[in-house]
Amino acid sequence: MEYNNMMELKFLSKSQNESFARTVVAAFAAQLDPTIEEIADIKTAVSEAVTNCIIHAYENKIGIITIRAFILDNKITIEVIDEGKGIEDVEKAMQPLFTTRLEEERAGMGFTVMQTFMDELEVESTPGKGTLVRMTKYIGRNR
């Protein structure tokens, strides 16, 4: 597929890299002239996706997280990819409040947050191989 622009970023699954990742994606999205609310939505969704990689995919061990972002017309698609443990049942994992970590604050809300702040959300996962979260936001839709 042909895009207007694209970027790729790879970084270690360390919690201090979460804010870096969301800032890079927000800076890339800025070329679409989004509203402050649209940028905040994107940053929140990216934060959730990256945090899921750190906590669930790699279980606080070090691995590689890849973010790809693609711009086509007024649409930005963001992929957050890990090579961690994968998700056994994606449909179940996407249900609000489903969690494998009962002790965590806000547990079970990551995918719900991503769905709330983005226009489209897709999750592909293979147990033992990793997960790809694809989020899409249409910029300027409400103007």
UniProtKB/Swiss-Prot annotation:
Listed SMART domains: HATPase_c
InterPro entries registered for this protein in UniProt: Anti-sigma-factor_SerPK, Anti-sigma_F, HATPase_C_sf
EC number of the protein: 2.7.11.1
Magnesium among keywords: no
Keyword Lipid metabolism on entry: no
Pfam families named in the record: HATPase_c_2
GO MF entries: ATP binding; protein serine kinase activity; protein serine/threonine kinase activity; sigma factor antagonist activity
GO biological process: asexual sporulation; negative regulation of sporulation resulting in formation of a cellular spore; sporulation resulting in formation of a cellular spore
Domain of life: Bacteria
EC class name: transferase
Catalytic activity: L-seryl-[protein] + ATP = O-phospho-L-seryl-[protein] + ADP + H(+); L-threonyl-[protein] + ATP = O-phospho-L-threonyl-[protein] + ADP + H(+)
SUPFAM superfamilies: ATPase domain of HSP90 chaperone/DNA topoisomerase II/histidine kinase
Keywords tagged on the record: ATP-binding, Kinase, Nucleotide-binding, Serine/threonine-protein kinase, Sporulation, Transferase
Purpose: Binds to sigma F and blocks its ability to form an RNA polymerase holoenzyme (E-sigma F). Phosphorylates SpoIIAA on a serine residue. This phosphorylation may enable SpoIIAA to act as an anti-anti-sigma factor that counteracts SpoIIAB and thus releases sigma F from inhibition.
Record family assignment: Belongs to the anti-sigma-factor family.
Protein name: Anti-sigma F factor
